[in-house]
Curated annotation (Swiss-Prot):
Pathway(s) it belongs to: Nucleotide-sugar biosynthesis; ADP-L-glycero-beta-D-manno-heptose biosynthesis; ADP-L-glycero-beta-D-manno-heptose from D-glycero-beta-D-manno-heptose 7-phosphate: step 4/4; Bacterial outer membrane biogenesis; LOS core biosynthesis
Obligatory cofactor(s): NADP(+)
Pfam family membership, one: Epimerase
Protein name as annotated: ADP-L-glycero-D-manno-heptose-6-epimerase
Matching SUPFAM superfamilies: NAD(P)-binding Rossmann-fold domains (SSF51735)
Family: Belongs to the NAD(P)-dependent epimerase/dehydratase family. HldD subfamily.
Residues noted as binding substrate in the record, renumbered to the chain: 169, 180, 187, 201-204, 209, 272
Amino acid sequence: MIIVTGGFGMIGSNIINALNDIGRKDILVVDNLKNGEKFINLVDLNIADYCDKDDFIASIIAGDDFGEIDAIFHQGACSSTTEWNGKYLMQNNYEYSKELLHFCVDRQIPFLYASSAATYGGRADNFIEERKFEGPLNAYGYSKFLFDEYVRRLLPEANSAICGFKYFNVYGPREQHKGSMASVAFHLNNQMLKGENPKLFAGSEHFLRDFVYVEDVAKVNIWAWKNNISGIYNLGTGKAESFQTVAQAVIDFHGKGHIETIPFPDHLKSRYQTFTQADLTKLRAAGYQDNFKTVAEGTKAYMSWLNRSLTTE
């Protein structure tokens, strides 16, 4: 059996899709379905069972036997960078993760988990997986940073794989439940469907992000599990691209429209990252050599998926 926490979420459901593609359906999905809209992410996928997150944690703490487990992909967390309830974040992103980590280490189960590029804070270069380059700017980033530090202390003594991925700007299928936290490509597509032009903040041609397609993220997770990889790694494309490039890819797909600019909000000016770019040196050294989709390639694929009902009519 394979366990995927946060399995109804964007990255979790794409990992399940990738597992299905290699013939694995013996999957226990763990999640909090308080947001019932997330159910749609697994409708076309195959799983064996579902367990509520709170019940799962209680079972983990109690030391319950889940049978033979081949791996745990821990994607369940509060992923909102605007959440400032520190107690809630630490319970969900830190304490929960520690319980799962020790459960896996004690039983020598491969443990693959979601970290975040938010651990780097507002830096503009040297996105390197080392403590000296990290300095989160929000409570979410701190919760992820603290767990990375915990893992670093445990790694030398572990006899099974522990692998964390600092996700950069992930976009792609199965994110519609995320609301305001969904990718810019998702929001721009919605604007186009309303008959509007895609809108970007003034200066967006200078705002560069490492946008990584979610299917590539899932692919790296499966590779790491299959190859027994340990450590903490950046997971982006290694190339920053502009929001303008995203908008142009959306326009190209729809075959109409032009970019409109809107004023940059004052309240974001002091805490808005103008640049992110994963340093992939460590991931490449670990053996991952496949290419990542560019923004143009990934956005085109995503637009086809998002608008599939329109293109099949």
